[in-house]
């Protein structure tokens, strides 16, 4: 029997978001910034329910509206494009997602420069999609560049540095460079332990990756 009790808070939240969106549409109009924000909030809720097609339609509407109102490179437009790219990738539309993420990277670089964390995170996201397409060489190049910049600007123990290091280890593992991948992931575990402790969620996740690597017959 399906347990629906745990789903009820999420269903209630989505209903509230729908009501808020309708109120905003009626009071302010379809293209008002508050309406577009309410639309994106509802898309997030639908995404959490697994209703990816409905979420994607709302995200597409928000992207179009923000492009008209704010322009292609406004931070709010880029945020909406980023959410749409995630939905596209989750539905298997990797090439479309990659094109949008490349657009985000260009926009972030133009607004913030190459070394800003938002730019570096955008490149990190792009690398994930590139890797999902099987282009591990390009993904590795992107992640190595992000890691070098993040370590230089913010230090190797910065959370973004450690996340990038772990992502790079995953790509190296997929490429078949198991020894280097394991060594890099081990560094992540050690720095997570020193920085956040053994019981931190990020530390436990890093340890779980190491354990997965050790169980792999190919290691």
Residue ranges of predicted features:
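Intrinsic-disorder-linked linear interaction elements in eukaryotic regulatory proteins
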Residues: 1-219
């Amino acid at each position: 029997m399906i347990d629906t009790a745990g789903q009820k808070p999420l269903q209630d939240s989505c209903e509230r978001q729908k009501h808020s969106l309708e109120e905003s549409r009626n009071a302010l109009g379809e293209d008002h910034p508050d309406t577009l924000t309410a639309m994106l909030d509802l898309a997030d809720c639908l995404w959490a329910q697994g209703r990816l097609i409905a979420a994607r339609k709302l995200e597409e509407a928000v992207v179009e509206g923000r492009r008209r109102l704010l322009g292609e490179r406004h931070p709010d437009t880029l945020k909406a494009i980023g959410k749409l790219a995630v939905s596209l990738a989750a539905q298997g539309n990797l090439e479309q997602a990659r094109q949008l993420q490349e657009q985000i990277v260009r926009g972030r670089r133009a607004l913030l420069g190459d070394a800003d964390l938002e730019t570096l995170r955008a490149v990190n996201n792009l690398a994930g999609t590139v890797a999902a397409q099987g282009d591990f060489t390009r993904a590795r190049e992107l992640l190595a560049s992000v890691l070098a910049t993040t370590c230089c600007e913010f230090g190797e123990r910065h959370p973004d540095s450690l996340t990038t290091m772990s992502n790079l280890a995953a790509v190296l593992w997929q490429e078949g460079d198991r020894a280097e991948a394991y060594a890099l992931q081990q560094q992540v575990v050690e720095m997570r332990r020193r920085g956040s402790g053994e019981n931190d969620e990020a530390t436990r996740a890093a340890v779980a990756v190491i354990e997965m690597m050790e169980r792999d017959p190919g290691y």
